[in-house]
A protein has these predicted regions:
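Conserved MFS/SLC helix-loop-helix module at the cytosolic interface between two early adjacent transmembrane helices
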Residues: 59-95
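Helix-loop-helix hairpin linking two adjacent transmembrane segments in secondary transporters
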Residues: 128, 137-184
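Helix-breaking motifs and short loop linkers at transmembrane-helix boundaries and internal kinks
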Residues: 40, 72, 93-99, 240, ...
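Extracytoplasmic gate region of multi-pass secondary transporters
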Residues: 29, 209-251
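A late C-terminal transmembrane helix in Major Facilitator Superfamily
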Residues: 328-360
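Paired small-residue
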Residues: 98-106, 298-306
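Cytoplasmic helix-loop-helix junction between adjacent transmembrane helices
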Residues: 103-141
Length: 402
């Protein structure tokens, strides 16, 4: 278990994942039906606003490592939190589609930066023997964001839609202040020096095992989209269950997302990172497919809870597997590559699925696609060598230019 000395690192990592994904992305999911119901945007426009965040996230993940090496960590993270807060506050009133698209894109960009840099800063500041326990807490921020949005947004919507946007902006500011508290107490100067010194060295080749994990993580991003972007609107409008019933499912998703990292940490210790990661892909593939068979209360609740568990659980399992394969010295760069793989596939699938919905007028085929892709990722991970830390290919990471 983490000790009190780990609280600053947990604060930094958890608030980073809370703002980056839990708020900047997942909080839009329960807002989506309301944006359509209240006539702010047509359904086809509203789903593209969700995809705008995914596109920004891709750019943020691409820039994260380079920016973190050139700029002060505290300032970079602080600006990212401010950008996410502004993206909510400045969208609190109806405006042009281009205005909303721009700020959803900016929130994604800031989220990509936070998701790569925040956990890396937190985990590299922790001794190896406690790193796994801290990682389990760091990624609970994703679920916290889903729970906050599921709990608060239905109540706020009874006031008006603008109130929901403003409160999400306030939560982003609070998260940023907590992260700054943690950063001021971490040995940032020492951590930054270590990262920069390592960046100046030749970067090792990626092993075959690492490449397969990175590719599988990209496939996870495609399976990630149906529930995290379209699930609430699917239940609310397409299946006519109403806002309250759909919000309850989003709450279950959030509860699962908080359980996920802790469950993943247990699996990793019990069965090893390699086997646990493949098992996680299989479970998520099955849970995504549940709506294809039934959306009765029991089955839709099972789908919400299990997918929530595996959304954050797979992030934790992938992070643990990468750390196992490459070690702490190369973790930040390889995790950055994994984030780029994830965000690239996520952005492409977000736009592709939005376009497919526009053509078909139904979300149901998207769940079939997500499930099949996750099953493919499971097969890919089963091909992964058991334990390979020595590079097996000549494919290398880009060297840092001094």
């Amino acid at each position: 278990m983490p000790s009190r000395r780990d609280l600053p690192a947990i604060a930094v990592g958890t608030t980073a994942t809370l703002a980056a994904v839990g708020l900047a992305r997942l909080a839009y999911t329960p807002l989506l039906p309301a944006v359509i119901h209240q006539g702010w945007f047509h359904s086809s426009q509203a789903v593209y606003l969700g995809a705008a965040n995914l596109l920004g996230y891709l750019l943020g993940a691409l820039l994260a490592v380079r920016l973190s090496e050139r700029f002060d960590t505290r300032k970079l993270l602080g600006l990212s939190f401010v950008a996410i807060a502004l993206s909510f506050v400045l969208c609190a009133l109806p405006a042009a589609f281009s205005w909303f698209f721009t700020w959803r894109f900016i929130s994604g960009l800031a989220g990509g930066l936070l998701m790569v840099v925040g956990p890396s800063v937190a985990l590299t500041a922790i001794p190896p023997e406690r790193r796994g326990a801290v990682a389990s807490f760091v990624f609970t921020g994703i679920g916290m964001g889903a729970i906050l949005s599921a709990s608060l947004i239905p109540m706020l919507l009874r006031l008006n839609l603008s109130a929901a946007w403003l409160v999400l902006g306030l939560l982003s500011i609070v998260a940023g202040l907590l992260a700054d508290w943690g950063l001021r107490r971490l040995a940032i100067n020492h951590a930054s020096t270590a990262v920069k010194a390592d960046a100046a060295l030749p970067v090792p080749a990626l092993s075959l095992a690492t490449l397969l994990v990175v590719l599988a993580y990209g496939l996870d991003a495609i399976g990630f989209v149906p529930h995290t972007v379209f699930w609430v609107d699917f239940l609310d409008r397409e299946k006519a269950l109403g806002t309250d019933a759909a919000s309850m499912q989003w709450l279950l998703f959030g509860i699962g997302a908080i359980i996920g990292p802790l469950f993943a940490g247990y699996l990793g210790k019990r069965f090893g990172w390699r086997r646990s990661l493949a098992l996680g892909f299989f479970i998520k593939a099955a849970a995504i497919a549940i709506p294809l068979l039934s959306i009765t209360l029991f089955w839709r609740s099972a789908s919400s809870l299990i997918v929530g568990i595996m959304v954050t659980g797979l992030v934790t399992l992938t992070s643990g597997r990468v750390m196992e394969l490459v070690g702490p010295a190369s973790y930040k760069r390889v995790w950055g590559i994994g984030a780029v793989s994830f965000s690239s596939a996520q952005a492409l699938s977000g736009y592709g699925m939005s376009a497919l919905y526009g053509i078909l007028g139904s979300y149901l085929p998207l769940f079939a696609i997500g499930s099949l892709v996750m099953a493919s990722g499971c097969l890919l991970l089963m091909l992964t060598p058991r334990a390979q830390t020595v590079p097996a290919t000549s494919i290398k990471l880009c060297k840092n230019e001094s």
